[in-house]
Amino acid sequence: WLALAAAPAPVVTLAISDVPGDDPAVIASGPTVPDPTTCAEALAVLKRYAIAVPDAVRTALAEGRWETPKPDHPHFARCRYHLIATPWESLAAAAEEARRFGFAAHILSDAIEGESQTVAQWHAALARAVVCHGEPFCAPCVLLSGGETTVTLPRKPADPLLPARGGRNSEFLLAL
């Protein structure tokens, strides 16, 4: 929608990706690029997972009231998109800086996905193996990774009056 609000001016997007795959429509929710998804797809997800939503939401989706600009919208012909940094490039820069300080640096992946707790436990096990056995890397070293973890919230919170606190990174660090 931001790209359309700027019309008729051309829009230049300089994006720094923080998501696996570097999909422009996903980076920062893609406010200046076309959205390939549809309201019909959203309805299909609601149905597939039996997600209850207010009737007004279901009606708005069914009528396409919240449809977003698609790739064939004429204004996107005046828009340019440049990916200026990726997760891998960020990890490589961090590794280079660690090496500058004399540490061996190892990039595990830029596309790790899964529950934050599980991913943290895997990282902790790897760190223990390095410290205790010198495998798969010699200590001391810097282990770097990136990706997109998730946190599954309980269906019924312990206290529904208290707002949820923290997030994926907090969950990862507490589990580490």
List PLM regions with ranges:
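Accessory alpha-helical/coil subdomains and C-terminal extensions
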Residues: 8, 12, 34-122
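Gly/Ser/Thr-rich active-site loops/lids in small-molecule metabolic enzymes
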Residues: 35-51, 156-176
